[in-house]
Every structure is written in structure tokens, then in C-alpha cells.
Design a protein with these regions (language model features):
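C-terminal catalytic/acceptor-binding lobe
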Residues: 112-191
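Glycine-rich, basic loop-to-helix element that forms the pyrophosphate-binding segment
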Residues: 23-40
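Acidic donor-binding segment of Leloir-type glycosyltransferases
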Residues: 1-24
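The conserved acidic donor/metal-binding loop of glycosyltransferases
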Residues: 49-53
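Conserved donor NDP-sugar-binding/catalytic core segment of glycosyltransferases
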Residues: 59-85
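Donor nucleotide-sugar recognition loop
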Residues: 95-116, 127
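Short aromatic/hydrophobic "clamp" motif used to bind/position activated sugar donors
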Residues: 45
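Conserved nucleotide-sugar donor-binding
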Residues: 41-42, 85-98
Length: 191
């Protein structure tokens, strides 16, 4: 394991705490984030995707913000694609909001839904704009989702036009399983 070999010095110093599980069999983004935040011991928790890294001064900046303000959460600028999953908030707010919704499986949307619930609970969304905090390791999109259930098990996808606002979706999985549903654009449909 790379982490045990490369980061043992920091693990032994207590700077890095490392947890690993072999369950579930496929990567589940919402579940992994919930587990990390539940295992965290600090008052302020931050999610940072594995392909991201922060610049010097980020922790100090966040601690100052959370010491001086109440009922807030920080995200990166949501216009930048590769840093979308970042969020910092007080651990108690995470627990009270019940974490990420684990119904969301696959890539994306779990962040948006979680941020929306925080806003509905009266928290204020702040955005850190310092360019030194926007560091990412560049890689192909395929690497981003390589361990996800859909990529490992999906065999075919069929789309059936219903009307300008609705499309029926049939997903065939390996092992003779399938999923079916309708994608509907409610906003466009109501105009």
C-alpha cells in the first residue's frame, strides 16, 4: 500500500491518521466521506478529494474563519471543475445535517445536495478564492471513476425519447441485472 509505505513517518508522528476498509466492494463517494467525517476528532472538518492538495496557509485561514464566524461552511469556487468536492464546516453541523446522502451512487451531485441541505439549515456558504488553495493533480476522467460500481458493472445504456423534457433510461449491468428510470427536466417543463 502506497500510503503505508510513503507516509509512515507522518502516521507515526500522529500528523496523519489512516483508516482503510475492504468494504464495500466498490467506491461509494458519499459513504466514504461520511465515514471520514464521523471518524474525525477535530471541531472543523474538511473534505478534500484525493487528487487535490492545498497551499500553504489553508489550515490557518480556515481556523481563523471558524473562530471568528458562526454557522458557515466553506467551499471552493464551484465554477472550477477539478476542485468541486471541497467543503469545510464544523463537525457538529455535519452531524446535525446527517452527512452526505448515501442514496447518491456514482460521480457527482452528492455535494450539491449536501450543500443545499446546509443552506436550508441556515448556514452561510463562503467561498475561498485564494489561488494558492486551488491545486490539483491532473489526470484522465477515466481515473476519476475507475473504482465506481457503474464503470465496473455497466454493460450498456439505452435512451428512449419520450418528449422534449423526458428520456427513459435502461441500464444493463453485467450479471443479468438492470436498472430503468426516467430523466426529467422539471425546470424546462414548467416554462
Amino acid at each position: 500500500e502506497w500510503i503505508a509505505q510513503s507516509m509512515m513517518k507522518y502516521i507515526e508522528m500522529g500528523i496523519l491518521v489512516y483508516y482503510r476498509t475492504t468494504e464495500p466492494a466498490y467506491y461509494r463517494r458519499s459513504h466514504s466521506r461520511n465515514m471520514v467525517f464521523r471518524l474525525a476528532e477535530g471541531e472543523v472538518v474538511c473534505n478534500l478529494d484525493a487528487d487535490n492538495y492545498l497551499g500553504r496557509g489553508f489550515a490557518e485561514f480556515m481556523l481563523k474563519e471558524f473562530n471568528n464566524k458562526e454557522r458557515l461552511f466553506y467551499t471552493s469556487n464551484l465554477c472550477y471543475r477539478d476542485v468541486f468536492g471541497r467543503v469545510c464546516l464544523e463537525r457538529k453541523e455535519f452531524v446535525e445535517a446527517r452527512g452526505y446522502n448515501e442514496v447518491f451512487v456514482g460521480y457527482g451531485l452528492e455535494d450539491v445536495e449536501f450543500f443545499n441541505r446546509l443552506l436550508c439549515r441556515g448556514l452561510v456558504q463562503e467561498i475561498f478564492n485564494q489561488k494558492e488553495f486551488y491545486n490539483v493533480l491532473m489526470h484522465a476522467d477515466e481515473e476519476r471513476i475507475a473504482q465506481e460500481f457503474l464503470l465496473k458493472k455497466l454493460q450498456s445504456v439505452y435512451l428512449d425519447y419520450i418528449n422534449p423534457y423526458s428520456t427513459r433510461v435502461l441500464m444493463l449491468y453485467k450479471g443479468q441485472r438492470f436498472g430503468i428510470g426516467v430523466i426529467q427536466n422539471n425546470i424546462a417543463m414548467n416554462y
